[in-house]
Amino acid sequence: REGGMAGSYLYQDPEAKYDYIADVFDTLIVRDIRQKYKIRNPILMNRIVDFLMDNISNLTSARNIADALTGNKDKINHKTVGNYMQYLCNAFAFYRVRRYDIQGKKYLASSDKLYLSDHTFRYAKLGTKNLDYGRVLENIVAIELLRRGYEVYVGVLYKKEIDFVAIKRNEKLYIQVSDNISDEKTFEREVNPLLQIKDAYPKLVLARIRDEAYQYEGVQIIDIADWLAEQPSTSQK
């Protein structure tokens, strides 16, 4: 919930801290977008922001958002939604991650994921509404991979999703992210798609295991806090 906003650490009171963070987002990002692109429907912009924050780590598209936000009276144009989404990405409020067909080695055009640049923006704006720690952790890992210089994609293999395919020059990582893998079914759900990948690049499951890293049939199981704290090169061993 703390995020990476340096100025927020000046505030001891949690409510004051999150008010500050929300104000930073509204002032430096949303207001700047409104002025730069001469937004004619600021209410729609705010609704799109809230929708994207509420659906971090979910596949989405401009058309899906337009359909979800369209009420009984007003029809929302998906092209307008797409423009607003692009403006938010241009302002680095969100990062767009495309889907990649691992077997076919091609990019997929339909539905991307948009990750929030700092997950604490979501908490400051929406509180604990629909809070899913698995999706929050996935968002954190996406931003960290980008920070480490990887090109990041959502992997698709035999209609199953690999959370991340991370590529940097001749390096490649396949990563699954989960809040808790103590349940056997959850563990299998996260590991099995990785086991179906036939190449020799590293395959990781990042989860809150609170234990030493270990391997399962060649898949590295790593505590997500340890992975975030380590030097980037160590994740490739």
Protein language model regions, located:
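Amphipathic alpha-helical segments of the small helical/lid subdomains adjacent to P-loop NTPase cores
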Residues: R1-M5
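Accessory nucleic acid-recognition modules appended to NTPase machines
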Residues: Y9-K172
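Hydrophobic/aromatic beta-strand patches that form the interior of the parallel beta-sheet core
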Residues: Y115, L173-I175, L204-L206, Q220-I222
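Hydrophobic, well-ordered secondary-structure elements that form the walls
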Residues: L145, D163, I175, L194, ...
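Nucleic-acid nuclease catalytic cores
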Residues: L157, K198-G218
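Short active-site-adjacent structural elements
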Residues: I162, D183-T186, E212-Y216
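Active-site ExK catalytic segment of metal-dependent nucleases
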Residues: K172-S182, E190
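Domain-level recognition of nuclease-like catalytic cores that cleave nucleotide substrates
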Residues: I209-K237
